[in-house]
Amino acid sequence: GILFIFMLFVIVVQSAIIIYSNLFELEHHLGFDASSAYLQAVEIWRCKSLVPSTFALTTTLGLDSPTPLAALFYGITGNIFLGFGIANIILDVVIAVIFYNLLKEFKLSAFEIALGFIFLLCPFMTPDHFIDNNLSYFAMVLGEQGSYSVKIITMLLLLWVVVQLEHRNNKALQAGSENVSHNNIKLYISIVFATLFSMLTAISSGIYVAITILVPCVFY
């Protein structure tokens, strides 16, 4: 209906804002965290090392962020802002793909999925280009330094694996001894990627994984 079409229009506008901001606006957002991430990406490329000796790490290794990917695109483009923007957009697409598959696992309607994407892609930014240290949703997940984009991917992958396992178990119970392995390939692939991303986040952020991933998995 008209409401669904309007929701799709909102999603397109949100996506356009995210893409434009990442490709053309990052140089105007140089808060402490963002500028540190940009500098780290430059040094990663210059030193050809994921942990450059010329950069003093103050919190995490930054491996579970767009920074390593941004370093690659910086080397290709010669522009750290464009390189970081491209890296952010790629990770945003990955987040969207996993989020879509997760919502599909719940058998949601197209309207419900569209509503979910409106919330996911909301480009919330702090007003007036606040640059002291922008910690808005956009800066943390969708653009700028994107500190939590890879962490979000990791958590969405794990949640997707859990939901798939639950649905697989339910199908097995309903089918009795009948073979229900037709979706095993997708499940195994998601388990592999969830494991790899969890390891990456564990190496980079340590205690974050223990609190947000390992403890919930143990309880599960």
Q: PLM features: residue spans?
A:
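Start-transfer (signal-anchor) and selected internal transmembrane alpha helices
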Residues: 1-19, 110-113, 186-191
